[in-house]
Amino acid sequence: MSEDDLMREVEKTKDRAMNAQAERTRYLGEFKERVIVALTKKQVAEDEMYIEVINAMKNKEATKMIFSREIPFSKIERYIKKAEQAQIQHKSVDGLLYFGDVGLIIVSDDALKVPVDNVFVTSISDKFSEKRLNQIYYQSFNKKICQFHLKVIREEMPEYKDEYQEISFVDKLFGMKCPICEKLGG
């Protein structure tokens, strides 16, 4: 091996080491090949829980949940409860050591058998936009809505059907109106 070849190998090794360290600082101290799913800090702070995180906790390779200490406990508490139910360890890490907007990850102890290309979850709001549903559908999470709009949710976004309830006859008697109908003029 010539001196030039040796220097190239040293440079490649150095680049790999630097990339690995940069990767770990982005993913809360973990290598990307161990990450099953990731949420941004903004997503963790939303009122709704992400189904993808709950499903990732059920993955046989999932061993722990790591979250940024910058996230208020009131927002991370529900994920901690789900992790405990799934018998997944959890820990918080100090945000000073890491850069980027990663707020929560579900990881394996080893590299995943089937690597995930994009570990980041699409925001719920963006999912509604992709289905061409008005943002009032998203804003009406955990509210009672009319039968028509509940049917739309069941057809277009079945994974979120349990986030809504149907307005009952009694609710209508007391003047309750569907927030989606009010916004869209239905």
Where in the sequence are the language-model features?
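Acidic, metal-coordinating catalytic cores used for nucleic-acid/nucleotide bond scission
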Residues: 69-75
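Short basic, glycine-rich beta-strand/loop surfaces that mediate nucleic-acid
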Residues: 82-134
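Anion (oxyanion) recognition and catalysis
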Residues: 58, 77-80, 84
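Charge-patterned, long linear interaction tracts outside catalytic cores
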Residues: 137-186
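Short, compositionally biased "basic patch" segments
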Residues: 1-47
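Ser/Thr/Gly-rich flexible loops in soluble cytosolic domains mediating phosphotransfer, phosphorylation
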Residues: 3-4, 16, 115-148
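Well-ordered alpha-helical segments embedded in enzymatic catalytic cores
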Residues: 23, 48-53, 75
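Short, surface-exposed connector motifs at secondary-structure boundaries
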Residues: 58-65
